[in-house]
């Protein structure tokens, strides 16, 4: 319809990169990292759907901040359906929480059905990225906006990518 043949269209589409933190992928050591920005219950539920679709052995990283750019009210995490990750037929996953409101996220996961003792709490970005670098297989990071910024910068640096703004 646009006068573009299918082969050209496919070649062009192969070069499209995902947007800043929106299903953005990184290879870090043996970890296949996907970053999925979350900002509200509806978007978080879609990220949970994606996370639940990943194969066994996935590592889930939840990074929750409450800075102005995130919105200072994080009560929305109670409206997201984290329970779907812990239904009896679901495969177990490694859980990590980080960010300014990591303790709130840990509590939310506990009430969703996660074993609280199995949830790792990591405060520093460097420590978190070091931990992710030691993972094998799929790692899915679900950060809020201000949590994503330093994580993405460190991942980009370690993976030899340019800063998003450059």
Where do the PLM segments sit?
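ATP-dependent carboxylate-amine ligase
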Residues: 2-7, 11-166
């Amino acid at each position: 319809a646009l006068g573009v043949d299918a082969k050209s269209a496919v070649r062009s589409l192969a070069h499209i990169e995902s947007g800043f933190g929106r299903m953005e992928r990184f290879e870090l050591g043996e970890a296949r990292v996907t970053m999925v920005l979350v900002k509200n219950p509806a978007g978080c539920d879609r990220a949970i759907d994606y996370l639940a679709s990943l194969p066994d052995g996935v590592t889930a990283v939840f990074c929750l901040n409450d800075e102005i750019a995130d919105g200072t009210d994080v009560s929305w995490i109670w409206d997201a359906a984290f329970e779907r990750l812990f239904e009896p037929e679901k495969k177990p996953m490694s859980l990590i929480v980080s960010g300014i409101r990591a303790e709130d996220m840990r509590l939310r996961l506990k009430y969703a059905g996660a074993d609280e003792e199995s949830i790792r709490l990591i405060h520093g970005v460097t420590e978190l990225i070091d931990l992710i670098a030691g993972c094998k297989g799929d790692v899915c990071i679900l950060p809020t906006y201000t949590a994503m910024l330093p994580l993405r910068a460190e991942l980009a640096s370690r993976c030899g990518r340019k800063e998003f703004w450059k």
